[in-house]
């Protein structure tokens, strides 16, 4: 098996769904923009690219019609580069990169661009629900259809995670991201994108279309306080503890990653940033899908002969504070190694792109700190966990 390396990973800034600067931007255009940035930054001949693999949490409407192929054709890759689309919900970006890595490791490909995208704005309210529910599943395993917020409430109640603990974790995420953003730690991974977006006047209801640029993440709230978080009403149950403040925010964005065999990267004179070392998935009860990493992480580490303490940095998708806290504490992960620059509660969580975003940031942070191993992991709708292991090239 050949060594597989990550040469580069880029993303758009993240914009608030419905109200942000991507609310008129197609997801395939966002992902194609990222692909073009990878080609330009690495002076890469598109004829060398064997495939374009794109993950998305919704595969219909604006993200239908094999968006992976559409991204290849829209971008500088062109007609000669094939493309595919996959869906493992919130791990779709990580899954796309894992598939690419395995294709390269097996010798079937040399160079692949892979990642993920999500325009929640253009897809969430137009989901086709015709024949959506299987009656047998609905009767026997109803949790598989629960909204994600409902599963977060179940995790909080089932495992005794208090509202206060969730709010404190959310504050930590906001503060860590604010510091990282102020220090420019996201600058290298974000490729600015010009957009047209719609703005509605709240008083008159009048709408206008403006020109803009997304060159930073716009979803975070640097002025967040514990008092402000405590004042928010529960979002999913009247007597619940999950709020808009301690859950990830609906957001739009794309991220794409450039993978190669080590030999190809060196032959092209490109600097490998990290080795892809492994990927695992595991199932759990659908009604507590947020704890999926508790099952996929040990499976990954066992396969690689590692322990929790061997991992220097952890990136967990941070869909909800309740599941973040449970996973961190159950796995006994050091909080100082865990989402060190904030997670999706602050940054935003476009479902399909998050895994690629996490990888791009993890690789950079490992190298900044001169550390070795990092794990990207996330919960997955339907009751799953996904985890990937990466080793920095130092």
Language model feature labels by segment:
Residues 56-110, 130-131, 142-150, 223-249, ...:
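Conserved catalytic cysteine-centered active-site region
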């Amino acid at each position: 098996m050949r060594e597989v390396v990550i040469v580069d990973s880029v993303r758009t800034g993240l914009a608030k769904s419905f109200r942000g600067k991507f609310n008129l931007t197609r997801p395939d255009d966002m992902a194609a923009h990222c692909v073009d940035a990878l080609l330009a930054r690495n002076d890469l001949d598109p004829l060398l690219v064997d495939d374009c693999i794109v993950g998305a949490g919704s595969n219909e409407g604006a993200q239908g019609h094999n968006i992976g192929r559409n991204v290849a054709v829209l971008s500088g890759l062109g007609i000669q580069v094939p493309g595919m689309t996959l869906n493992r919900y919130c791990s779709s970006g990580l899954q796309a990169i894992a598939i690419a890595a395995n294709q390269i490791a097996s010798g079937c490909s040399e160079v692949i661009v892979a990642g993920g995208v999500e325009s929640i704005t253009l897809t969430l309210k137009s989901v086709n629900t015709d024949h959506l529910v299987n009656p047998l599943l609905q009767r026997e395993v109803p949790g598989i259809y629960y909204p994600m917020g409902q599963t977060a409430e179940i995790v909080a109640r089932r495992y005794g995670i208090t509202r206060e603990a969730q709010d404190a974790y959310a504050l930590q995420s906001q503060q860590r991201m604010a510091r990282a953003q102020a220090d420019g730690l996201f600058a290298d991974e974000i490729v600015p994108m010009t957009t047209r977006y719609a703005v509605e006047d709240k008083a008159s209801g009048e709408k206008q279309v403006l020109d803009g640029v997304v060159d930073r993440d716009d979803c975070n709230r640097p002025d967040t306080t514990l008092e402000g978080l405590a004042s928010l009403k529960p979002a999913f149950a009247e007597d619940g503890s999950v709020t808009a403040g301690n859950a990830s925010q609906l957001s739009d964005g794309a991220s794409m990653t450039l993978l190669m065999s080590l030999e190809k990267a060196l032959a092209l004179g490109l600097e490998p940033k990290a080795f892809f070392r492994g990927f695992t998935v595991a199932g759990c009860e659908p009604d507590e899908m947020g704890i999926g990493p508790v099952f996929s992480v040990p499976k990954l580490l066992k396969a690689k002969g590692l322990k929790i303490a061997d991992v220097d940095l952890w990136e967990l998708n941070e869909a909800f504070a309740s599941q973040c806290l449970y996973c961190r504490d159950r796995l006994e992960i050091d909080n100082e190694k865990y989402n060190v620059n904030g997670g999706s509660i602050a940054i935003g969580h476009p479902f399909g792109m998050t895994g690629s975003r996490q990888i791009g940031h993890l690789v950079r942070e490992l190298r900044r700190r001169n550390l070795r191993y990092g794990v990207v992991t996330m919960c997955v709708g339907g009751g799953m966990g996904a985890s990937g292991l990466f080793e920095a090239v130092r």
